[in-house]
Amino acid sequence: MNNIIQLLETEQTQGKEIPDFRAGDTVTVQVKVKEGNRERLQAFEGVVIARRHRGLNSSFTVRKVSHGEGVERVFQLYSPLIASIKVNRRGDVRRAKLYYLRNLRGRKAKIKEKI
């Protein structure tokens, strides 16, 4: 039973081209949005504040500030709704989960770039 699950998971994950990114990186996620009968791509750019490594159920959380309001979105890594993930900037952080950014505003919420 366990081998069948692993076989299905590897089959699902092989086709996806996923860049190497971690918490602190700024990414742009192209999401497929269906409106009525037409489909378009919507870009969501922000800082990765968490990654969850669970095989096929892997996910990551992206945070951005839009019109002064913090917006977080959780994406399933192997979801068919994700068209592409692009890493714009590498962040230099010392934590795996950056939930403390929720309480920071302005320049304090800025993450240093990795050199």
UniProtKB/Swiss-Prot annotation:
Gene3D superfamilies: 2.30.30.790. GO terms for biological process: translation. NCBIfam families: rplS_bact (TIGR01024). Belongs to the bacterial ribosomal protein bL19 family. This is Large ribosomal subunit protein bL19. It comes from the Bacteria. One of its GO terms (molecular function) is structural constituent of ribosome. SUPFAM superfamilies: Translation proteins SH3-like domain. Transmembrane segments: none annotated. One of its GO terms (cellular component) is cytosolic large ribosomal subunit. Keywords: Ribonucleoprotein, Ribosomal protein. The gene is rplS. It comes from Coxiella burnetii (strain RSA 493 / Nine Mile phase I). This protein is located at the 30S-50S ribosomal subunit interface and may play a role in the structure and function of the aminoacyl-tRNA binding site. PANTHER family: LARGE RIBOSOMAL SUBUNIT PROTEIN BL19M (PTHR15680:SF9), RIBOSOMAL PROTEIN L19 (PTHR15680). The lineage of its organism: Bacteria, Pseudomonadati, Pseudomonadota, Gammaproteobacteria, Legionellales.
